Amino acid sequence: MGGFFSSIFSSLFGTREMRILILGLDGAGKTTILYRLQVGEVVTTIPTIGFNVETVTYKNLKFQVWDLGGQTSIRPYWRCYYSNTDAVIYVVDSCDRDRIGISKSELVAMLEEEELRKAILVVFANKQDMEQAMTSSEMANSLGLPALKDRKWQIFKTSATKGTGLDEAMEWLVETLKSRQ
């Protein structure tokens, strides 16, 4: 039986793991999301200086997930990790109205990179459990997402600490990746 599912997986995705980058400004919740996806619970995190890389299995699919630090001094190095990326999870702090413009600038610059031309974009409007959180449509407009014409993208309301919205986002990502094969 296991061989049957392995052959289905191989026919859909080949034998390689899907490569996903988790990007966003510092404090957005990237590392919390990574470990919530990997172990299913919130773990204590510290600011990421450099990167974390983990293999995440979701719905029997393996993803190599790279969580890159979001501090100003680290962001220029994001491009070193773009090669062979299947999808980008872009995490935005829904409560950080002061830096939504910076988040948009970083997103736009990233999406202009040739190596990410075919990468699927999933935006996590994170910290939706907070009272002052922007709505997902407000965030989509602030980030300029409706203007993206030649890219498959979707935005999801998430709370990394509560775990809400993560399954829906990952379901969409898996289905979208499958449809590209």
Curated annotation (Swiss-Prot):
Detected in heart, liver, lung and liver (at protein level). Detected in fetal heart, lung, liver and kidney. Detected in adult heart, placenta, lung, liver, skeletal muscle, kidney and pancreas. The keyword RNA-binding does not apply. It comes from Homo sapiens. Disulfide bonds: none annotated. It is a peripheral membrane protein; Lipid-anchor. This is ADP-ribosylation factor-like protein 1. The keyword rRNA-binding does not apply. Keywords: Golgi apparatus, GTP-binding, Lipoprotein, Magnesium, Membrane, Metal-binding, Myristate, Nucleotide-binding. Belongs to the small GTPase superfamily. Arf family. Pfam families: Arf (PF00025). GO terms for molecular function: enzyme activator activity; GTP binding; GTPase activity; metal ion binding; phospholipase D activator activity; protein domain specific binding. Changing Q71L: Altered Golgi structure with an engorged lumen. Interacts with ARFIP2, GOLGA4, RGPD8, SCOC and UNC119. It comes from the Eukaryota. Mg(2+) binds at T31, T48. Its main location: Golgi. One of its GO terms (biological process) is intracellular protein transport. GTP-binding protein that recruits several effectors, such as golgins, arfaptins and Arf-GEFs to the trans-Golgi network, and modulates their functions at the Golgi complex. Plays thereby a role in a wide range of fundamental cellular processes, including cell polarity, innate immunity, or protein secretion mediated by arfaptins, which were shown to play a role in maintaining insulin secretion from pancreatic beta cells.
